[in-house]
Amino acid sequence: MHIMEFPREVILGKNVISETVNVAKRLSFSSPVLVVYGPKTKEIAGKDVERVLKEEFDVHSVIVKEATINEVEKVEGIIRDNKVKWAIAVGGGTIIDVTKLASYRAGIPFVSFPTTASHDGIASANASIKGLGTKTSIKARPPVAVIADIRIIKSAPRRYLAAGVGDVISNITAVRDWKLAHKIKGEYFSEYAAALSLMSAKMVMRDAEIIRIGDDEGVRKVVKALISSGVAMSIAGSSRPASGAEHLFSHALDLLLEKPALHGEQTGIGTIIMAYLHGINWRKIKETLQKVGAPTTAYELGVDPEIIIEALTIAHTIRPERYTILGRDGLTREAAERAAKITGVI
């Protein structure tokens, strides 16, 4: 049996914080609610969301600092102890992922209120949490609603929007890997999920100039593409439409680096290299990332070239059951170095 779950409402516009109450009413939510935010996102939007919700609901709040299993358990404990009926995550990937898994484990719905458009977790069922063995994604449930305030997302540093493009563009190689796994391993493949995923990537490539400007229209396009990516994963019932070898490379960097770059920045560079391995137009991908201001080299990413090579050689071990262009044995050091050099990453 294949159950597809999607957000029931997506609100995308300017100054939509006040909509949180209306969304909650339409979804028949009751008190109490838990507002989850980070130290920074509390000031950016968290306090305002809290204030609006207090007009109609009993509100609890909690600060989350990192995407670890300890933080998930802390939030889950607050939900259970206070008999919280629903949660709202106000923040970036860390806050959304922790709230997603904690609410799933506690059996309550959650609303996603992204303050950046840096990765496709804003509407997907998957959460990346450290402390579960390796930092790969774990399946939970997607948000029942997404409330994206363009004014808030636009005010975030520009690199976040560029990282969002990096995460969406990785759908190109992810779908290639998925097709490969279908052909070689007989893995389930959904044409519909793949088409939606690729459409999201093609949209950001087509609109790179608009996104580069970073105005309302550019933000809107990236947010829509990220949400479509999340929906594609829900249709597939896995992260396959948006996560292939380029994500394994990013997870490898997470393990090797004390302070990794943004997820979408890493997957963007991974996509350039994996596109080269697939024999598809990696130059066009690189060009798009350059246009929007995303890093395309190890230097721009702030990572030693040696680490890039090592990440490429261990990427296949991150999730052995996920078949990709890297195959079962992965890349040799020579092949990894050659791919990174030819694409200009190192």
From Swiss-Prot:
Cofactor(s) in the UniProt record: Zn(2+)
Cofactor comment: Binds 1 zinc ion per subunit.
Cell compartment(s), UniProt: Cytoplasm
Coiled-coil ranges per UniProt: none
InterPro entries per UniProt: G1P_dehydrogenase_arc, G1PDH, Glycerol_DH
Main subcellular location of this protein, as a coarse class: cytoplasm
Record EC number: 1.1.1.261
Entry keyword annotation includes Transmembrane helix: no
Catalytic activity: sn-glycerol 1-phosphate + NAD(+) = dihydroxyacetone phosphate + NADH + H(+); sn-glycerol 1-phosphate + NADP(+) = dihydroxyacetone phosphate + NADPH + H(+)
Taxonomic superkingdom: Archaea
GO terms classed as biological process: glycerophospholipid metabolic process; phospholipid biosynthetic process
TM annotation in the entry: none
Gene Ontology terms for molecular function: glycerol-1-phosphate dehydrogenase (NAD+) activity; glycerol-1-phosphate dehydrogenase (NADP+) activity; metal ion binding
Keyword NADP included in the entry's annotation: yes
Alphabetic keyword roster: Cytoplasm, Lipid biosynthesis, Lipid metabolism, Metal-binding, NAD, NADP, Oxidoreductase, Phospholipid biosynthesis, Phospholipid metabolism, Zinc
Task performed by this protein: Catalyzes the NAD(P)H-dependent reduction of dihydroxyacetonephosphate (DHAP or glycerone phosphate) to glycerol 1-phosphate (G1P). The G1P thus generated is used as the glycerophosphate backbone of phospholipids in the cellular membranes of Archaea.
Family: Belongs to the glycerol-1-phosphate dehydrogenase family.
Protein name: Glycerol-1-phosphate dehydrogenase [NAD(P)+]
Biological classification of the source: Archaea, Methanobacteriati, Methanobacteriota, Thermococci, Thermococcales
Gene, per the UniProt record: egsA
